[in-house]
């Protein structure tokens, strides 16, 4: 992204040193975060490669003032397991080097949770900082810089006086890029807060530019004696991102940068709160509901993202940066709930319990706050929603809440959980949390074990992403860097595995379970895996009506051949503590042979290790004459046993998705997909029992 017209005006070069008479206040801040309960080795790697060497280096320069925000759980993890790193933080805090900045303890998107929870999370982190670091925050880090004016009241209610956003927030709202060298003030309902605009130019420069160019970038922000160069960005850029550890520490970038800043008489490092106390605001600002520009791109559906990219290219960098930035933009962060129904489901399940939290015990309330962690709800250049372990964590917290509410007697309810206008049938036994969709064929959309806190229905749909075009139509992209610099992860220069194309398959319906397919042909393995079978029924992704008296989902649908043949489908469920059964009735006026298939999709932590009737799924398998199948999972020490009253053909494969991450493109095993099929003519009755057993 070309940022020449963003704040600080332009990236400097060695021939443009800035005005030597003007000084600038450097407001330098870093934010560190790991998804709540992330893999231990991932957290340890972040600490070893990034957090530990950063604070160890900064300890040598206590006169360098800077701001730090950390999600609360990560800070406590460091305090508990890496006391030396925490000691460096405490030392720098006592020396007046660090200003601690607040936010939600578990790093929620504040505008995506209610005020009660937002204030509870903000206050929880503030109390932690006061108790353990003797620091009371005055400012807030805005998670993923997702701005809605509704957050002002919550921040002010918690005693916070300022928040950092991107300069893009201002530019997209019509502000001049040359006036981003201080703070503005905004309000909501008369509650006022200060807004500091983070310089995109500095965000893309540090630590990727060499030391000299980095200092020159800061000096470019010097317009008058009150000017501030504002940078607040991911600490992970300083050691954890690809190639940065060697660059920042082994090659000495950080040490050289800090020394160069301290030696430069034109630059004064200052805390945000100090600048707020000693300088006037630049005026009043009302900002769009937005995040950083890239987030707006990512939240669009794939065809819209490609159209936005093409439009930017047609406008050209110069016009876009000068005038187009206020007019051309992507979607809002909450679009991720529209783009990914899997994200929306997690979010709305959380919101349902938040709304009814008066009935939650302390442990369940803490699980609710953990469930509000943002990482799993979106996807961009990082894995996010595509990472199964993040979704597993989210469902663990959700099932902790459900477990606290479960009784010996099975409880049922009918409510629109995901707020899509269609009600879901919710079943809570003493052992299982189950939800069935009326919008999608009476299908199973949650299958959670209250004992293991694991959701076997934590599945993902294969969908087209804008970045898949880089795999389908690769282009040679040369990295545009100077000597003594490194690339950002936003560079398009990435090595592509040519076999990734093989897994670029796209589904036309959500990957739930008990999905009803009808075809004129026997289902082949290749057609099932490739989603290329000839579907002639309208039951796989269409609404059913729920009959509360018979506990059954029904649809008056059709089989579509030379004409529509009226076809009726009824699905009646019954429940026990650890099992449930489905009695299927299918009646069609089409009298000739058709093929019925029932699709299951089950998520496992390690799909490659699961045994299906004693053998691994591997590259896929097919079995004939199946009346019973058992999926043994060593991770949960449970087995899913499916019994049928008729012999079926079985096809099974491990479903992979191709997603983008900070290290390139990744093939991720999401779930095991199964299809049990058999022929029928006019009428079919099929009884299926699902049981959870110990291994």
Give the location of each predicted region:
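CE4/NodB-like, metal-dependent polysaccharide N-deacetylase domain
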Residues: 117-143, 220-235
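Short, well-structured secondary-structure segments
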Residues: 24-114, 120-121, 138-142, 161-167, ...
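Acidic-aromatic substrate-binding/catalytic surfaces of carbohydrate-active enzymes
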Residues: 44-48, 116, 120-123, 433-547, ...
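Active-site and substrate-binding clefts of carbohydrate-active enzymes
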Residues: 22-52, 59-61, 180-183, 189-193, ...
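Gly/Pro-rich turn-and-neighbor structural signature
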Residues: 116, 131, 135-136, 141-185, ...
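Acidic (Asp/Glu-rich), glycine- and aromatic
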Residues: 441, 446-452, 459-465, 470-474, ...
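A contiguous, surface-exposed recognition patch within enzymatic or periplasmic domains that forms
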Residues: 465, 469-529, 614-685
């Amino acid at each position: 992204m070309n940022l020449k017209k963003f704040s600080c005006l332009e990236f400097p070069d060695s021939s443009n040193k800035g005005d030597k008479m003007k000084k600038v206040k450097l407001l330098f801040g870093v934010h560190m975060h790991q998804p709540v309960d992330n893999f231990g080795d991932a957290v340890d790697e972040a600490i070893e490669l990034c957090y530990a060497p950063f604070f160890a280096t900064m300890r040598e320069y206590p006169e360098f003032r800077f701001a730090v925000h950390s999600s609360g759980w990560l800070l406590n993890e460091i305090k508990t397991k890496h006391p030396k790193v925490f000691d460096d933080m405490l030392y720098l805090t006592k020396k007046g080097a660090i200003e601690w900045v607040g936010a939600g303890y578990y790093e929620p998107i504040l505008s995506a949770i209610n005020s009660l929870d937002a204030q509870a999370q903000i206050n929880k982190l503030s109390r932690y900082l006061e108790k353990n670091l003797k620091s009371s925050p005055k400012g807030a880090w805005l998670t993923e810089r997702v701005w809605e004016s509704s957050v002002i009241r919550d921040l002010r209610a918690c005693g916070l006086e300022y928040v950092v956003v991107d300069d893009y927030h201002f530019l997209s709202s019509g502000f001049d890029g040359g006036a981003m060298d201080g703070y503005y003030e905004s309000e909501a309902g008369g509650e006022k807060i200060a807004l500091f605009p983070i310089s995109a130019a500095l965000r893309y420069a540090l630590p990727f530019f060499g030391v000299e160019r980095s200092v020159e970038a800061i000096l470019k922000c010097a317009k008058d004696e009150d000017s501030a160069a504002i940078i607040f960005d991911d600490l992970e850029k300083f050691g954890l991102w690809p190639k940065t550890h060697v660059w920042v520490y082994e090659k000495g970038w950080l040490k050289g940068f800090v020394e160069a800043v301290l030696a430069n008489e034109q630059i004064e490092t200052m805390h945000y709160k100090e600048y707020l106390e000693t300088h006037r605001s630049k005026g009043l600002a009302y900002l769009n509901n937005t995040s950083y520009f890239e987030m707006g791109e990512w939240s669009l559906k794939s065809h819209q993202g490609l159209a936005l990219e093409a439009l930017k290219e047609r406008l050209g960098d110069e016009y876009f940066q000068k005038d187009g930035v206020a007019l051309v933009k992507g979607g809002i962060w909450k679009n991720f709930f529209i783009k990914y129904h899997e994200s929306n489901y997690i979010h709305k399940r959380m919101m349902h319990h938040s709304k009814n939290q008066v009935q939650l015990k302390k442990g369940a309330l803490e699980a609710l706050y953990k469930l509000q962690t943002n990482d799993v709800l979106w996807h961009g250049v990082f894995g996010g929603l595509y990472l199964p372990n993040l979704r597993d964590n989210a469902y663990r917290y959700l099932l902790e809440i459900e477990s606290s509410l479960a009784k010996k007697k099975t409880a049922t309810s009918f409510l629109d959980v995901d707020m899509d206008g269609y009600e879901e049938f919710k079943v809570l036994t003493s052992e299982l949390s189950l939800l069935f969709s009326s919008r999608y064929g009476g299908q199973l959309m949650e299958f959670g074990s209250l004992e293991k806190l694991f959701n076997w229905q934590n599945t993902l749909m294969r969908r087209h992403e804008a970045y898949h075009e880089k795999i389908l139509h690769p282009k040679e992209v040369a990295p545009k860097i100077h000597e003594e610099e490194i690339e950002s992860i936003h560079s398009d220069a990435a090595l592509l595995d040519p076999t990734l194309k093989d897994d670029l398959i796209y589904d036309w319906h959500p990957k739930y379970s008990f999905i009803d397919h009808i075809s004129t042909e026997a289902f082949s393995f290749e057609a099932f895996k490739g989603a290329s079978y000839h579907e002639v029924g309208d039951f796989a992704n269409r609404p059913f009506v729920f009959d509360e008296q018979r506990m059954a989902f029904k649809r008056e649908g059709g089989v579509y051949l030379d004409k529509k043949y009226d076809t009726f489908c009824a699905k009646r469920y019954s429940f026990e503590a650890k099992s449930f059964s489905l009695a299927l009735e299918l009646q069609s006026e089409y009298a000739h042979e058709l093929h019925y298939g029932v699709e299951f999709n089950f998520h496992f932590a390690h799909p490659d290790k699961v045994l299906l009737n004693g053998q691994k799924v591997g590259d896929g398998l097919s079995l004939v004459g199946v009346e019973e199948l058992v999926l043994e999972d060593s991770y949960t020490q449970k087995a899913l046993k499916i019994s049928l009253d008729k012999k079926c053909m079985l096809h099974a494969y491990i479903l992979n998705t191709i997603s983008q991450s900070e290290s390139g493109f990744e093939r991720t095993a999401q779930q095991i997909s199964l299809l049990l099929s058999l022929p029928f003519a006019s009428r079919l009755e099929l009884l299926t029992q699902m049981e959870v057993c110990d291994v």
